[in-house]
C-alpha cells in the first residue's frame, strides 16, 4: 500500500494511527524521525495534546492528566520502532524478517520511500523506486504481512491536486 501526499499533509500521523489501531504487531521504520518523536506523536494522537508540547514540556496539570490517559491507552500496543535512520533497503528487509520471527509482526510501515537506497546500478531514481516497491511487495507476500510505504508527491504548481503522475520518482509503482 502506498500512501502519498505533499509534504506536511499528515502521512506519518495517518500511518501511526493505522499502526495503533490495527490490533496487531507492527514494525515501524522511520528514516527521518527518532522513536521519541514518533512516541510523542502517538501520545499526542491518544491524548489530544500537541506533540510539540509533549516534546518540549509545555504542560499544565490538565494536559499532564490527558497525557497520562493517552499513555494508558497506548501502553502495550505492539509497535516496534526502528529509527536507526538506515536507508538501505537490504538492512530494512533483513530487519523485517527478524521482527517477523521475534515479534510475529503482521504489518510494516516504511516512512518514507524516497529516502531508501537500493544497491543497484540503475541509471535513474524511478527505476530504483520501482525496485524498492517490488521488494517490499515481495516481502509482504513472503511473510504474509501488509506493508505501507509513505511517499512524497512532487511539486506541481500547474496542477496542485494529487495525481499518480506526481508520485515523486515512483512512476514504476503507480
Show where each model-derived region lies.
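Short hydrophobic/aromatic beta-strand immediately N-terminal to the Walker A/P-loop
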Residues: 1-3, 27
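Cytosolic-facing regulatory segments adjacent to core modules
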Residues: 13, 17, 21-104, 118
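Conserved ATPase-coupling elements of RecA-like P-loop NTPase cores
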Residues: 117-125
Amino acid at each position: 500500500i502506498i500512501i502519498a501526499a505533499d509534504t506536511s499533509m499528515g502521512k506519518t500521523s495517518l500511518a501511526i494511527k493505522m499502526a495503533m489501531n490495527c490490533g496487531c504487531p507492527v514494525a515501524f521504520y522511520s528514516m527521518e524521525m527518532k522513536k521519541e518523536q514518533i512516541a510523542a506523536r502517538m501520545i499526542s494522537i491518544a491524548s489530544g495534546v500537541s506533540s510539540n508540547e509533549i516534546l518540549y514540556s509545555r504542560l499544565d496539570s490538565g494536559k499532564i492528566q490527558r497525557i497520562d490517559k493517552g499513555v494508558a491507552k497506548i501502553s502495550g500496543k505492539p509497535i516496534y520502532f526502528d529509527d536507526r535512520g538506515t536507508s538501505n533497503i537490504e538492512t530494512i528487509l533483513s530487519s523485517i524478517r527478524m521482527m517477523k520471527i521475534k515479534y510475529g509482526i503482521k504489518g510494516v510501515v516504511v516512512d518514507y520511500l524516497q529516502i531508501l537506497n537500493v544497491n543497484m546500478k540503475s541509471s535513474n531514481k524511478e527505476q530504483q523506486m520501482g525496485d524498492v516497491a517490488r521488494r517490499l511487495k515481495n516481502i509482504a507476500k513472503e511473510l504474509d504481512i501488509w506493508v505501507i510505504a509513505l511517499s512524497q508527491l512532487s511539486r506541481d504548481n500547474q496542477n496542485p491536486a494529487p495525481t499518480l503522475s506526481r508520485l515523486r520518482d515512483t512512476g514504476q509503482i503507480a
